[in-house]
């Protein structure tokens, strides 16, 4: 059966049978007996407009496949790789489950350790700020969860509250604006800034 990948015949995509779903469903139904048939963690397969629910675990985390992925798997299955196609969905659902559970666990650790605290704002509204990884409460973490969610944090965030409070105070910016620009003063401040940065980096590495 030829189906357009661009999604023109979406109805045929949704009714496309998932390879291995029939083979896996009786075994899974015996393995995970739901408490009652109306529970969302029962191993019922449902099709939602181009998406098919592969697996839904007790934390209501759902693994989806798109219609294009189903189409590719169906083409693989007709190509004579039926055993591989039967092994693929369970493997993909396990990977999706592991990834989703890992992200939820990471969020739990973040919400446990990264308690937001208040910053007084200039315009009267109170902002909430997440403490950076340099604070004491995150020292007990065996791994660094911020690296999994985004790239390496900038130095001012890594150094904690001290870098926020002292980053611009020692430069005396208001005096620099009032006084005429003196090259010696600026050069001294620039040297002081680079030396201070080197010292911070050296202390970080050791």
Swiss-Prot record:
- Is Cytoplasm one of the keywords UniProt gives this record? yes
The record's induction entry says: Up-regulated by hypoxia in cultured rheumatoid arthritis synovial fibroblasts. Down-regulated by TNF in cultured rheumatoid arthritis synovial fibroblasts. Down-regulated by the inflammatory mediators LPS and TNF in primary monocyte-derived macrophages via a c-Jun N-terminal kinase mediated mechanism.
**One BP annotation, GO:** inflammatory response
- State the compartments where it is located: Cytoplasm; Cell projection, Cilium
- Coiled-coil spans in chain: none
Annotated region described as Disordered, given as residue ranges: 1-41
Please report the PTM annotation for this entry: Phosphorylated.
Alphabetical UniProt keywords: Acetylation, Cell projection, Cilium, Cilium biogenesis/degradation, Cytoplasm, Inflammatory response, Phosphoprotein, Protein transport, Transport
| Tissue specificity statement from the Swiss-Prot or TrEMBL entry | High expression in normal macrophages, monocytes, and cultured rheumatoid arthritis synovial fibroblasts (RASFs), with lower expression in B- and T-cells, and little to no expression in other tissues and cell lines.
Its main subcellular localisation, reduced to a broad class, is: cytoplasm
Which residues, renumbered to this chain, carry the PTM Phosphoserine? 25, 140, 167
As stated in the Swiss-Prot or TrEMBL entry, residues carrying the post-translational modification N-acetylmethionine are 1
**GO CC annotation, single:** cytoplasm
Describe its assembly.
Answer: Interacts with UNC119 and UNC119B; interaction preferentially takes place when UNC119 and UNC119B are unliganded with myristoylated proteins.
Q: What does this protein do?
A: Regulates the macrophage function, by enhancing the resolution of inflammation and wound repair functions mediated by M2 macrophages. The regulation of macrophage function is, due at least in part, to its ability to inhibit glycolysis. May also play a role in trafficking of proteins via its interaction with UNC119 and UNC119B cargo adapters: may help the release of UNC119 and UNC119B cargo or the recycling of UNC119 and UNC119B. May play a role in ciliary membrane localization via its interaction with UNC119B and protein transport into photoreceptor cells.
Family in the record: Belongs to the UNC119-binding protein family.
Listed name of the protein? Macrophage immunometabolism regulator
């Amino acid at each position: 059966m030829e189906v357009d990948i661009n999604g023109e015949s979406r109805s045929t995509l949704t009714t496309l049978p998932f390879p291995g779903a029939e083979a896996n469903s009786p075994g899974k139904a015996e393995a995970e007996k739901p408490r009652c048939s109306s529970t969302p963690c029962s191993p019922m397969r449902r099709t939602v407009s181009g998406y098919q629910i592969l697996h839904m675990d007790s934390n209501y985390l759902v693994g989806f496949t798109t219609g294009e992925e189903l189409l590719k798997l169906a083409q693989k299955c007709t190509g004579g790789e039926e055993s591989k196609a039967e092994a693929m969905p369970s493997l993909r659902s396990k990977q999706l489950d592991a990834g989703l559970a890992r992200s939820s666990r990471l969020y739990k650790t973040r919400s446990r350790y990264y308690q937001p605290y208040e910053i007084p704002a200039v315009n009267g509204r109170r902002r909430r700020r997440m403490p950076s990884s340099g604070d004491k409460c995150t020292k007990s973490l065996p791994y660094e969860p911020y690296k999994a969610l985004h790239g390496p944090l900038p130095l001012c965030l890594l150094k904690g509250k001290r870098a926020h409070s002292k980053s611009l105070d020692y430069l005396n910016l208001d005096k620099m604006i009032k006084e005429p620009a003196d090259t010696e003063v600026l050069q001294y401040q620039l040297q002081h800034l680079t030396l201070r940065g080197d010292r911070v980096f050296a202390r970080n590495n050791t």
